[in-house]
């Protein structure tokens, strides 16, 4: 049955933007039918061309802005919006912070938790050039090996040298490595024919240490001219202390493969976080915005209310960043992580920092919690920093039955945070302090936050 829509593809309309979606798109309505529009801000009057319609909503492109928002700023370049690198760059930074605070508050209000206080988002003095890691695809464009970023929802590589939100030293390193690979006629990966050699260039740089790692991801085990390529990278980039070839032979969108070959230097780089030193490998999960991560983790430590006598469980412990920073303020910390290399890194990092009261186990968070519960481990505080999908129901059940006094929830997805808070309520936990958003990813809609739950006595 054909649905009668109030707009059709190709139609040009004058509309007023009412709001922003959680993805940062402007929303206009025609007869209560929403149109989602990139590069449009609330209260702007625009001319929009409808590009796609569905039964429940449409998408459109801005043809002309007829009344400009006072909060609009001149974007640095269209390419950052087209690729999704910086989809909020047209919104002034103070308003980005308000938008993120509002997003979190609105999600709580939708489930009738209007009484939850959400504090203003903690921002950055310089909300650009903050990322300490880049993973840049390599493809053949107009006959030569090229680096850049994909246009959104496409396989079209857009050549880029300045990524705007990355450490400029990393941007420079990518260009240097690209030019060396061009010089020696290395073949770029062709994803359609699964041919060619160079798939991705990854660069990590320590914010404090300035140590740099270059990872060349290849389809083949053999990297032609590997020795001379490595020597030239080291000569051109004195900060490089680690050059690694990562082999990913599968036809996949996953960036890194399972095999790392150290071509020069170390297998890891070091960096500091809240006074501790961490070894970071090619595969390590390590927060990409070190300045904001220190604020985020210090907040989590403060909210945990540690006096030095507590037992803490750190679920999703990664390379031990939260576990080890908390271990300095607790009696004992137990960390769990499902990635073997991360557990190895966590144990090395404990040794590196002389920390003896942190124990790390390789397992899923859900299974480890059940085992600790069976073994009679009684945590005072549980810290969680889950992926975007949030916490598993079995994990929350185990956590609730272990009955810690406090749960500190570091969230990268406010939707799953709100869902999980409701699940914790079934075990007698309530939010005991205002929720604090932290802007880990300026110029994007992504939101991190810290929430504290306490058990009702």
Curated annotation (Swiss-Prot):
Active site: 412
Keyword set includes S-adenosyl-L-methionine: yes
Record GO terms (molecular function): rRNA (uridine-C5-)-methyltransferase activity
The organism's place on the tree of life at top rank: Bacteria
Residue positions binding S-adenosyl-L-methionine: 287, 316, 337, 385
InterPro entries from the UniProt entry: MeTrfase_TrmA_AS, MeTrfase_TrmA_CS, NA-bd_OB-fold, SAM-dependent_MTases_sf, TRAM_dom, U5_MeTrfase_fam
Record flagged with keyword Transferase: yes
TRAM domain sequence ranges: 6-64
GO BP, sorted A to Z: rRNA base methylation
Keywords recorded for this protein, A-Z: Methyltransferase, S-adenosyl-L-methionine, Transferase
EC number assigned by the record: 2.1.1.-
Protein family according to the UniProt entry: Belongs to the class I-like SAM-binding methyltransferase superfamily. RNA M5U methyltransferase family.
Name of protein: Uncharacterized RNA methyltransferase lp_1151
């Amino acid at each position: 049955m054909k649905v009668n829509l109030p707009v059709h593809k190709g139609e040009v309309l004058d509309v007023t933007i009412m709001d922003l979606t959680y993805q940062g798109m402007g929303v206009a309505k025609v007869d209560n039918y929403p149109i989602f529009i990139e590069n449009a801000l609330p209260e702007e009057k625009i001319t929009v061309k409808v590009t796609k319609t569905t039964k429940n909503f449409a998408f459109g492109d801005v043809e002309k802005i007829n009344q400009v928002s006072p909060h609009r700023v001149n974007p640095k370049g269209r390419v950052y919006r087209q690729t999704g690198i910086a989809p909020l760059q047209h919104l002034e930074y103070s308003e980005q912070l308000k938008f993120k605070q509002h997003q979190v508050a609105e999600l709580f209000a939708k489930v009738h938790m209007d009484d939850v206080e959400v504090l203003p988002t903690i921002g950055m003095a310089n909300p650009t050039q903050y990322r300490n890691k880049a993973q840049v695809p390599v493809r053949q464009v107009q006959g030569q090996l090229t680096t850049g970023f994909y246009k959104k929802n496409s396989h079209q590589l857009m050549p880029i040298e300045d990524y705007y939100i990355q450490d400029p030293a990393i941007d420079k390193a990518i260009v240097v490595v690209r030019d060396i690979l061009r010089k020696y006629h290395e073949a770029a990966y062709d994803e359609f024919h699964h041919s060619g050699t160079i798939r991705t260039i990854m660069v990590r740089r320590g914010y404090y240490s300035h140590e740099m790692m270059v990872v060349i991801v290849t389809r083949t085990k053999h990297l032609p001219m590997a020795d001379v390529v490595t020597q030239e990278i080291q000569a051109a980039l004195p900060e490089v202390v680690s050059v690694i070839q990562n082999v990913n032979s599968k036809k996949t969108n996953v960036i890194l493969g399972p095999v790392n070959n150290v071509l020069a230097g170390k297998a890891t780089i070091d960096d500091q976080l809240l006074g501790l030193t961490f070894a970071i490998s090619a595969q390590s999960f390590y927060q990409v915005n070190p300045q904001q991560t220190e604020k985020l983790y210090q907040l989590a430590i403060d909210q945990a209310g540690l006096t030095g006598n507590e037992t803490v469980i750190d679920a999703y412990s990664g390379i031990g960043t939260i576990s080890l920073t908390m271990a300095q303020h607790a009696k004992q910390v137990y960390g769990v992580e499902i990635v073997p290399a991360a557990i190895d890194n966590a144990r090395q990092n404990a040794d590196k920092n002389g920390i003896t009261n942190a124990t790390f186990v390789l397992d899923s968070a859900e299974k480890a919690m059940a085992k600790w519960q069976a073994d009679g481990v009684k945590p005072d505080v549980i810290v969680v920093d889950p992926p975007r999908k949030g916490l598993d129901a079995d994990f929350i059940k185990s956590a609730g039955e272990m009955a810690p006094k406090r749960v500190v929830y570091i969230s990268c997805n406010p939707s799953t945070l709100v869902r999980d808070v409701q699940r914790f309520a079934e075990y007698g936990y309530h939010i005991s302090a205002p929720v604090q958003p932290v802007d880990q990813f300026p110029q994007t809609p992504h939101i991190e936050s810290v929430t504290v739950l306490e058990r009702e006595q």
